[in-house]
């Protein structure tokens, strides 16, 4: 019963799409109609720039943190992991936006930094390094997600947290499947390439 309640609460928190809300009420646009069509911080960055993207990223991280803390309060570490997966699913497929959301990376950052701070920080650092070196946000996001899985395999804690990391990485890779195709084709947009709003 608590597992279901935890998942529902976390999913609904994830459904609060900050990219959509902030751009809708500050710029009067639906961010999903611009750039990549993704309702997330990276697309806000691409379309509107750093000043618009920063609060979106921060709030997306925050909702991951809040969901995990609620899950931990209700069910301990198991609840934290259930909530972590559910909040990312809510961000990716929000019921209030006809299941058209973001890719879950900023929210995943909040999740892993709360569930496993040390390994999460290492994975984040590696992901950010890849972004800085290549200018590909998608590549850095995927690398960071996979790194978190590898770190959990190397510094084994429990089967539960390894499966948790595997599910999060699978969600990230699935949401970036079109980016992966563009990376392989050499047509992926780099950080700094901006789509102007008319």
UniProtKB/Swiss-Prot annotation:
Pathway: Lipid metabolism; phospholipid metabolism. The chain crosses the membrane at residues 2-22, 48-70, 75-97, 111-131, 154-174. It is found in: Cell membrane. Pfam families: G3P_acyltransf (PF02660). It comes from the Bacteria. GO terms for biological process: phospholipid biosynthetic process. Keywords: Cell membrane, Lipid biosynthesis, Lipid metabolism, Membrane, Phospholipid biosynthesis, Phospholipid metabolism, Transferase, Transmembrane, Transmembrane helix. GO terms for molecular function: acyl-phosphate glycerol-3-phosphate acyltransferase activity. Its EC number is 2.3.1.275. It catalyses: an acyl phosphate + sn-glycerol 3-phosphate = a 1-acyl-sn-glycero-3-phosphate + phosphate. It is a multi-pass membrane protein. GO terms for cellular component: plasma membrane. The keyword Cell membrane applies. Probably interacts with PlsX. Belongs to the PlsY family. PANTHER family: GLYCEROL-3-PHOSPHATE ACYLTRANSFERASE-RELATED, INNER MEMBRANE PROTEIN YGIH. NCBIfam families: glycerol-3-phosphate 1-O-acyltransferase PlsY. Catalyzes the transfer of an acyl group from acyl-phosphate (acyl-PO(4)) to glycerol-3-phosphate (G3P) to form lysophosphatidic acid (LPA). This enzyme utilizes acyl-phosphate as fatty acyl donor, but not acyl-CoA or acyl-ACP. This is Glycerol-3-phosphate acyltransferase. It comes from Thermoanaerobacter pseudethanolicus (strain ATCC 33223 / 39E) (Clostridium thermohydrosulfuricum). The lineage of its organism: Bacteria, Bacillati, Bacillota, Clostridia, Thermoanaerobacterales.
């Amino acid at each position: 019963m608590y597992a279901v309640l935890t998942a529902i609460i976390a999913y609904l928190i994830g459904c609060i799409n900050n990219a959509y809300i902030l751009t809708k009420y500050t710029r009067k646009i639906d961010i999903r109609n611009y750039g990549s069509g993704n309702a997330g911080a990276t697309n806000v960055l691409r379309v509107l720039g750093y000043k618009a993207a920063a609060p979106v990223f921060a709030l997306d991280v925050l909702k991951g943190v809040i969901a995990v803390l609620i899950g931990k309060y209700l069910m301990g570490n198991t609840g934290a992991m259930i909530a972590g997966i559910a909040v990312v699913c809510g961000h990716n497929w929000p019921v209030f936006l006809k299941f058209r959301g973001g890719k879950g990376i900023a929210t995943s950052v909040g999740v892993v930094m709360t569930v496993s701070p040390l390994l999460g920080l290492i994975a984040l650092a590696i992901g950010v390094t890849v972004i800085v070196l290549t200018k590909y946000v998608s590549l850095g996001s995927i690398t960071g997600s996979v790194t978190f899985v590898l770190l959990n395999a190397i510094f084994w804690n429990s089967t539960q947290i390894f499966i948790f990391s595997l599910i999060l990485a699978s969600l990230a890779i699935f949401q970036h499947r079109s980016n992966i195709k563009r990376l392989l084709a050499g047509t992926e947009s780099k950080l700094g390439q901006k789509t102007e709003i008319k």
